[in-house]
Structures are given as C-alpha cells and as structure tokens.
C-alpha cells in the first residue's frame, strides 16, 4: 500500500503521486516515511529529499520548508525543490562561489547568516546533481 505524496512550492506543484517511501532532511536528522506512519509535523532542512517508487530512487534538492505526515498522505511545503536531473550544475557552482564571496565580505551577523544559508542551499544542489550524475554513469 503506497503513501500519497504532494510536494508544493509557492510557484507550483512539483509532485503529486503515490510512492513507497520518502526520506527527508529535518531539524532532527533524516526521517524515513512509510505508509501508515504516525502523524508528524516537522521543519525541513536544506538537503537531499529521496522518493522511492517501485524500487526506483528519485533524488531532489530541497532548500527547506515544512512537512506534514498523516497515515496515508504526506504534504511537503518547500521553499524551493528541484529534481536532480533539473539542476544546472554550472549555475549552481557559480551561485556557490557568489555566496562564498558574500560570506567573506559580510559586514554584519545578518549578512553572514544570509550568505551562509545561500551557501548551504547551493552546496546541497551541487551534491544532489553530482550524485545523480554518478548514478547515471553507473546505469
């Protein structure tokens, strides 16, 4: 019996499908969600979101957000989320370099926090894209 997953951003519905398992990065570490999971509401951290369906793993890069889990449905409200195969690695690398430069030049704690958050997001995007590229080569 699958669990229904909806991944939504402010711009669009990214995914609405029945899946076998979801693995997400939360404030308390990675959490795996299977059908009939206990109800849960949690904050998502930037990281790799994995969906398993019919034995196939589909990775996404998520920049943060919230997740609501009910026994037969999961709703993820993400700040941003991208499928691994949609990530432009060159643009992500450029954004990472810009975030590092902003961090070095930060004049206040607020500027530093913003630059570090952007840097974390871009590092996640790069890691997910690179892992996807390795997986494709092995297939």
From Swiss-Prot:
Superkingdom of origin organism: Bacteria
Protein's name according to its UniProt entry: ATP synthase epsilon chain
SUBUNIT field: F-type ATPases have 2 components, CF(1) - the catalytic core - and CF(0) - the membrane proton channel. CF(1) has five subunits: alpha(3), beta(3), gamma(1), delta(1), epsilon(1). CF(0) has three main subunits: a, b and c.
Molecular function terms, GO-annotated: ATP binding; proton-transporting ATP synthase activity, rotational mechanism
PANTHER family per record: ATP SYNTHASE DELTA/EPSILON CHAIN, ATP SYNTHASE EPSILON CHAIN, CHLOROPLASTIC
Gene name per UniProt: atpC
CDD domains in the cross-refs: F1-ATPase_delta
GO CC terms of this entry: plasma membrane; proton-transporting ATP synthase complex
Keywords carried by this UniProt record: ATP synthesis, Cell membrane, CF(1), Hydrogen ion transport, Ion transport, Membrane, Transport
Subcellular location, principal: membrane
InterPro entries, per the entry: ATP_F1_dsu/esu_C_sf, ATP_synth_F1_dsu/esu, ATP_synth_F1_dsu/esu_N, ATP_synth_F1_esu_C, ATPsynth_dsu/esu_N
UniProt-annotated location(s): Cell membrane
Originating organism: Chloroflexus aggregans (strain MD-66 / DSM 9485)
């Amino acid at each position: 019996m699958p669990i229904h997953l909806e991944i939504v951003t402010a711009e669009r519905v990214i995914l609405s499908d029945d899946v076998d398992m979801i693995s997400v990065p939360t404030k308390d570490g990675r959490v795996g969600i299977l059908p009939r999971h206990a109800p849960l509401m949690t904050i998502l951290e930037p990281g790799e979101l994995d969906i398993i369906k019919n034995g196939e793993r589909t990775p996404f890069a998520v920049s943060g957000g919230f997740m609501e889990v009910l026994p037969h449905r999961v709703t993820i409200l993400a700040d941003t989320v991208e499928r691994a195969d949609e990530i432009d690695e060159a643009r992500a690398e450029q954004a990472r370099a810009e975030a590092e430069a902003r961090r070095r030049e930060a004049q206040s704690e607020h500027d530093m926090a913003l630059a570090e958050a952007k840097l974390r997001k871009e590092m996640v995007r790069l890691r997910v894209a690179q892992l996807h590229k390795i997986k494709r080569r092995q297939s």
